[in-house]
């Protein structure tokens, strides 16, 4: 399976095709939130997305399933920058080179990524 992140730490692709499939975006959101909970020690991280569309919503569902909250157009612990065109470009800030390696380790590791259930699932705010 090809790498998800470019050497600049971005995710690029056509929505619906790898790496921007619904399943993969869900897993990226899950891993991103898990990284912030475990590594940054933020109990309920917040992801800020610029708008709602297939890409941002698939990512958001994974992020919320890990226990984080998602805001549209407001501040958060993590901010998603989205460049649309024939190829979509997703950039997360702040995200260091080390963070990217940790994310890929979570995504491609043998252990399942932890998921929250019930009331522990995060929220979505417009």
UniProtKB/Swiss-Prot annotation:
It comes from the Bacteria. Gene3D superfamilies: Alpha-D-Glucose-1,6-Bisphosphate, subunit A, domain 3 (3.40.120.10). This is Uncharacterized protein aq_1627. The lineage of its organism: Bacteria, Pseudomonadati, Aquificota, Aquificia, Aquificales.
């Amino acid at each position: 399976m090809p790498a998800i992140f470019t050497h600049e730490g971005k995710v690029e692709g056509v929505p619906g095709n790898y790496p921007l499939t619904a399943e993969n975006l869900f897993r990226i959101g899950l891993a991103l939130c898990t990284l912030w909970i475990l590594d940054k020690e933020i109990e309920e991280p917040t992801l800020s997305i610029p708008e709602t569309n297939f890409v941002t919503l698939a990512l958001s569902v994974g992020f919320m399933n890990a226990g984080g909250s998602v805001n549209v157009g407001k501040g958060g612990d993590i901010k998603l920058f989205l460049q649309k065109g024939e190829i979509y470009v997703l950039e997360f800030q702040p995200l260091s080179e080390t963070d990217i390696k940790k994310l890929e380790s979570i995504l491609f590791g043998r252990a399942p990524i932890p998921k929250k259930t019930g009331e522990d699932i995060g929220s979505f705010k417009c």
